[in-house]
């Protein structure tokens, strides 16, 4: 796949709509040409201890952050006409659909691909198929796992190799 947008969300709690950060990496003709990162004020606006342990974000980090519709207005022009790619599509696509629903936004039925699913098929001998493991197998060292932009970059790298 030569043209796509890799996307990753982190959530504040167990509600898929509680996106608190997003990373997007734009790939055209097989090259990374743009990226976007933003903190987001989550909805519902509370942080679960375990989620904060994963990504390190707390309510203090996002209390001045924009709400999702404002962030998405910045992302929409970047991803226009591109399929979306995530590592574990059910999670990230689920987040996107849930937050669209919460804000009563019309979901445009994005074309979505899953590097996790494909990696299990094309790299069956890996110890596991976690993002950092697959990224490393594809020649990319993920330095800041669970930072949305770092994870989106790793996903983009994987997608360029296996999709």
Regions found by a protein language model. Name each.
Residues 117-120, 136, 157-160:
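Generic alpha-helical structural context detector
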Residues 1-109, 124-146:
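Conserved non-catalytic scaffold segment of RNase H-like nuclease domains
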Residues 11-13, 117, 154:
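Short, glycine/acidic-enriched loop or turn micro-motifs at the edges of active sites
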Residues 147-160:
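Acidic, divalent-metal-coordinating active-site segment for phosphoryl/phosphodiester hydrolysis
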């Amino acid at each position: 796949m030569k043209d796509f947008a890799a996307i990753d969300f982190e959530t504040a709690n167990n509600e898929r709509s509680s996106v608190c950060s997003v990373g997007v990496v734009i790939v055209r003709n097989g090259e990374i040409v743009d990226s976007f990162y933003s903190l987001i004020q989550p909805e519902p606006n509370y942080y679960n201890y375990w989620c904060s342990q994963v990504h390190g974000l707390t309510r203090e980090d996002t209390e001045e952050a924009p709400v999702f519709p404002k962030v998405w207005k910045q992302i929409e022009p970047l991803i226009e006409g591109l399929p979306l790619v995530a590592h574990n599509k059910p999670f990230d696509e689920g987040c996107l659909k849930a937050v669209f629903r919460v804000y009563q936004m019309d979901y445009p039925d994005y074309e979505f691909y899953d590097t996790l699913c494909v990696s299990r098929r094309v790299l069956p001998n890996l110890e596991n198929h976690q993002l950092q493991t697959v990224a490393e197998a594809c020649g990319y060292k993920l330095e800041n796992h669970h930072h949305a932009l770092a994870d989106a970059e790793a996903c983009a790298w994987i997608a360029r190799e296996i999709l």
